[in-house]
């Protein structure tokens, strides 16, 4: 029997849905560190790469224990960032989002922080020392 169009669409929509729910996300003993708002070159592809990495991570079954945003990457955690909902989702999964206060101060963005914990250098070093793997973007 050939499935009708409704059944086919249901399968396709279900198959491509996001695979992670808060209850099933597991924390790996790792830390991801973002220092820029792009990966590689500062062009459309580089900016899309950061977006793609964070969105894919938010749909993964295993997420890092920490994600650190420092230098210009703190801009991803402030008001009007296109990635706020994605980073919020990761935080709800239990990922500890650390945002460098020094960078926010230098960029005059401290009052615009909307996701994550304001962190000092001691917090950042402590997080790095708690994990087995640090991934730097």
Regions found by a protein language model. Give the residues of each.
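A glycine-rich helix N-cap at a beta->alpha junction
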Residues: 83-109
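Helix-enriched interaction subdomains in cytosolic or periplasmic regions
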Residues: 1-16, 26
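General beta-strand structural signal in soluble alpha/beta enzymes
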Residues: 69, 99-100, 135-137
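C-terminal structural segments of small proteins and small subunits
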Residues: 114-130, 135-136
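Conserved mixed alpha/beta catalytic, RNA-binding, or beta-rich assembly cores of soluble enzyme
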Residues: 17-80
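Short, well-ordered alpha-helix to beta-strand connector turns
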Residues: 28, 64, 94, 131-132
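Short amphipathic alpha-helical segments and helix-helix/interface helices
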Residues: 54, 84-88, 125
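Glycine-rich, charge-decorated loop segments at or immediately adjacent to ligand/cofactor-binding or catalytic sites
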Residues: 75-80, 106-113
């Amino acid at each position: 029997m050939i499935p009708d169009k409704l059944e086919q669409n249901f399968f396709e929509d279900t198959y491509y849905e996001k695979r992670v729910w808060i209850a099933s996300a597991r924390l790996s003993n790792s830390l991801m560190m973002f220092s820029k708002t792009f990966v590689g070159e500062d062009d459309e592809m580089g900016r899309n790469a950061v977006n793609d990495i964070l969105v894919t991570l938010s749909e993964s079954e295993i997420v890092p224990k920490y994600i650190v945003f420092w230098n210009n990457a703190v801009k991803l955690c402030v008001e009007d960032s296109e990635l706020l909902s994605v980073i919020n989702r990761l935080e709800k999964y239990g990922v500890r989002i650390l945002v460098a206060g020094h960078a926010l101060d230098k960029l005059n963005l401290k009052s615009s922080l909307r996701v994550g914990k304001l962190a000092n250098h001691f917090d950042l070093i402590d997080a790095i020392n708690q994990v087995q793997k640090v991934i730097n973007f």
